[in-house]
């Protein structure tokens, strides 16, 4: 029986490109090579495409993918050269130009099935402000927030924020993930500095009420029918779970499943599934919650392409449900093919 090709797209132009490389290297080792043949393509920080390694058997732990530090100009290709009939693309790309609908639109033009959610849902979920407004309309609880758009009056925004929120306050670029560009403000001066930092990454800024809370995450999997995992908890050794703590210092651990009251667990899974449906997601997502000290539950973020290394929360949540890392990848490929056929059938 001939093997099906999985195309791994990794790298990208966003500040989250290093996370993408880690995810791709994990996936290429976990794939079932009895069924699949793997081709990898790197998108450089400049936005160019490079044809990198191919694998017909499981690569060794020492095998590393091309990065911006090891570019080989002779491997540069046209973006459309990734096309292969009947191949499925796994876009292991995070942040802008990766999970914001850009690459999804490109793959739909190429008529290639791809893992993950569609153009519109990717765009909505990538923008934290738009996500909040959609989830508000679905009745899903969230922390209070204000918004600053570059070009608007900053002083008016600060006045509104001080009237609406209390310190500590978190300031976030609307279109970044992995905690890139996010900072915590505990004073008016700190708020100004946090907004200035966030503006380096985006022109749309989300300003949120800080809460003392446990950080709980739920995995989602499916297309028109969605399944959710039992929650897992992020346990921090730092005050703020930022990019450095997540990916460099390893100052976090995870409790899977989280120790949570059964009623709250059910409520959390319900809200996660409703959020997935509200944005029209498909394939996979990870829903992140705050469980406050007073027992209130707030949906913090919906991530349509969560970190996908073997030690990332999303695969571990599914492993706890009895779905192994390798089988999860296979299920995502199947869901990608299902959605591709559905999209094609709608083009009447």
UniProtKB/Swiss-Prot annotation:
Annotated localization: Cytoplasm
Positions that bind Mg(2+) 1: 288, 301
Residue stretches making up the ATP-grasp domain: 132-334
Predominant subcellular localization, coarse grouping: cytoplasm
ATP-binding recorded as keyword: yes
Binding residues annotated for Mg(2+) 2, in chain numbering: 301, 303
Positions of transmembrane segments: none
EC identifiers of the protein: 6.3.2.4
Keywords assigned by UniProt, alphabetized: ATP-binding, Cell shape, Cell wall biogenesis/degradation, Cytoplasm, Ligase, Magnesium, Manganese, Metal-binding, Nucleotide-binding, Peptidoglycan synthesis
GO cellular component: cytosol
Catalytic activity field: 2 D-alanine + ATP = D-alanyl-D-alanine + ADP + phosphate + H(+)
Biological function: Cell wall formation.
Protein name, as recorded: D-alanine--D-alanine ligase
Protein source organism: Streptococcus uberis (strain ATCC BAA-854 / 0140J)
Phylogenetic lineage: Bacteria, Bacillati, Bacillota, Bacilli, Lactobacillales
């Amino acid at each position: 029986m001939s093997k099906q090709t999985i195309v791994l797209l990794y790298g990208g132009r966003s500040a989250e490109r290093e996370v993408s490389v880690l995810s791709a290297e994990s996936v290429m080792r976990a794939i079932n090579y009895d069924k699949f043949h793997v081709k990898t393509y790197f998108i450089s920080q400049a936005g160019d495409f490079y044809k990198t390694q191919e694998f017909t058997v499981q690569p060794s732990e020492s095998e590393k993918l091309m990065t911006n530090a090891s570019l080989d100009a002779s491997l540069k290709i046209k973006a459309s050269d990734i096309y292969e009939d009947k191949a499925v693309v796994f876009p292991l790309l995070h942040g802008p130009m990766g999970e914001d609908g850009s690459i999804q639109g490109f793959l739909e033009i190429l008529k290639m099935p791809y893992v993950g959610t569609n153009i519109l849902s990717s765009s909505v979920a990538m923008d934290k402000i738009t996500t909040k407004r959609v989830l508000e309309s679905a009745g899903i609880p969230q922390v209070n927030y204000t918004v600053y758009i570059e070009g608007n009056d900053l002083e008016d925004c600060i006045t509104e924020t001080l009237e609406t929120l209390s310190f500590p306050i978190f300031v976030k670029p609307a279109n970044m993930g992995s905690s890139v560009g996010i900072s915590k403000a505990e004073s008016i001066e700190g708020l100004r500095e946090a907004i200035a930092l966030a503006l380096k990454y985006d022109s749309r800024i989300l300003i949120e009420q800080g809460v003392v809370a446990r950080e709980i995450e739920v995995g989602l999997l499916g297309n028109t029918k969605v399944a959710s995992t039992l929650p897992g908890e992020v346990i921090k050794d730092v005050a703020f779970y930022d990019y450095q703590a997540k990916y460099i210092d390893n100052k976090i651990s995870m409790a899977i499943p989280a120790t949570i009251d059964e009623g709250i667990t059910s409520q959390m899974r319900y809200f996660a599934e409703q959020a997935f449906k509200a944005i029209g997601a498909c394939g996979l997502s990870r829903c992140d919650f705050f469980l406050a000290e007073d027992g209130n539950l707030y949906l913090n973020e919906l991530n349509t392409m969560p970190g996908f290394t073997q030690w990332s929360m999303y695969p571990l949540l599914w492993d706890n449900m009895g779905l192994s890392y390798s089988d999860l990848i296979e299920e995502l490929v199947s869901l990608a093919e299902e959605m591709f056929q559905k999209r094609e059938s709608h083009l009447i």
